[in-house]
Amino acid sequence: HKAHVSLEQVLEREKPIDMLIHLGDVEGGADYIEALAGCPVHIVAGNNDYFSDLPQEEEFVVEGNHIFITHGHYYYVSMGESDLLKEAKGRDADIVMYGHTHKPSLHEEDGVTILNPGSISYPRQSGRQKTYMIMEIDASGMPEIELKYV
């Protein structure tokens, strides 16, 4: 949601990064994010990206990990993750990432890592702290994911 100042703070703190993944609601800021990141960027459209030509979802592989990203609203994530998990399993994803709820979550279910980094703009979890996640993949291909605060 156009949280450019928070994004700038996060990128300055975490740089250099190898990839940035944005899970939707850029509200026209995709070009700015891509220019600011200085690395490959994956962005999907959120429910507030009305006239965007961004993809609804993407799949890609990082160090042997099949990653599926979506904003999540088409999978009704506000009511639970079961539809999203079913889709991720159908796509043989190792990791599924979604946004929409603005609440951070990280867990594994049926062999799929499910994560929501929360929000650096409008957090909705208890305490309403702005959050994001950093994923590092070790030499064996195992991802380590950490929740961080702006």
PLM regions with names:
Residues 19-25, 42-47, 68-71, 95-100, ...:
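Active-site neighborhood of phospho(di)ester-bond hydrolases with catalytic His/Asp-centered motifs
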Residues 40-83, 91:
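Helix-adjacent hinge/juxtasegments
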Residues 59-61, 107, 136:
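Well-ordered beta-strand positions
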Residues 1-40, 49-51, 55-56, 127-131, ...:
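N-terminal active-site segment of His-dependent metallophosphoesterases
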Residues 38-40, 64-66, 111, 142-144:
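A generic structural signal for alpha->beta connector loops
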Residues 5-8, 63, 86-93, 115-150:
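Binuclear metal-dependent phosphoesterase catalytic core
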Residues 2-6, 27-31, 48-53, 75-79, ...:
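Active-site environment of divalent metal-dependent phosphoester hydrolases
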